[in-house]
């Protein structure tokens, strides 16, 4: 079954992850109006949308719910605060009845090495270099460590965390340098911090990662 997990974070908040597969049909999981909208989307977007609605049904037991979007592009859902993320192979939803929430999932890939300077500050890069003990003076930045699984994991955690915080504070449209990562260690799952520097608000980022994906969320 493509459902990877549904996890109750607290009494009002649920997190779900779905592995995108070809066998799903839109009319099995999507409301009629969503099925009509799908006809105007490319094949990849169709698969992502169907996976999201399959997961939504698994999490709520309802097929009538329609995900909308506000002026900032943030997903909306009657009766819930919701955040949605999808990447190659996976779709994730976090939803709460009472609290703001945000989630991001990213498949493992080395693209993240090419954009280090885009989303990490020099201070954050130095922090990660220290964390990974890259003392070799011939290595200018963490971007040089493309063969390192740990380096890839650390970068993906930082990328997903900033995407998560951007979604959480969607009205502010934060820039990457307005978010500061504090990642001192990491494993298969755990927590670290990311601060909205514009408001000086530190948020706890909860993460999980394996050989296929990295996922982060906050509430």
Tell what function each PLM region has.
Residues 1-219:
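Core catalytic alpha/beta fold that binds nucleotide/phospho-ligands
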């Amino acid at each position: 079954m493509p459902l990877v997990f549904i996890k109750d974070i607290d009494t009002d908040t649920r997190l779900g992850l779905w592995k995108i597969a070809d066998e799903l049909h839109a009319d099995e999981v999507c409301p009629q109006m969503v099925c009509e909208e799908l006809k105007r989307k490319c094949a990849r977007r169709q698969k992502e949308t169907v996976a999201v609605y399959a997961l939504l049904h698994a999490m709520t037991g309802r097929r009538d719910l329609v995900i909308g979007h506000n002026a900032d592009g943030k997903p909306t859902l009657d009766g819930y605060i919701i955040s949605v993320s999808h990447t190659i192979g996976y779709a994730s939803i976090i939803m709460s009845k009472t609290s703001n929430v945000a989630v991001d999932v990213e498949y493992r890939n080395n693209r993240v090495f090419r954009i280090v300077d885009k989303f990490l500050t020099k201070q954050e890069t130095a922090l990660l270099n220290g964390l990974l003990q890259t003392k070799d003076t011939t290595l200018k930045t963490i971007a040089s460590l493309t063969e390192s699984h740990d380096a890839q994991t650390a970068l993906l955690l930082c990328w997903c965390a900033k995407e998560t915080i951007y979604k959480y504070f969607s009205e502010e449209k934060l820039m990457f340098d307005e978010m500061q990562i504090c990642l001192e260690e990491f494993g298969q799952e755990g927590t670290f911090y990311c601060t909205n520097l514009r408001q000086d608000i530190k948020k706890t980022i909860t993460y999980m990662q394996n050989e296929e994906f990295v996922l982060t969320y906050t509430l």
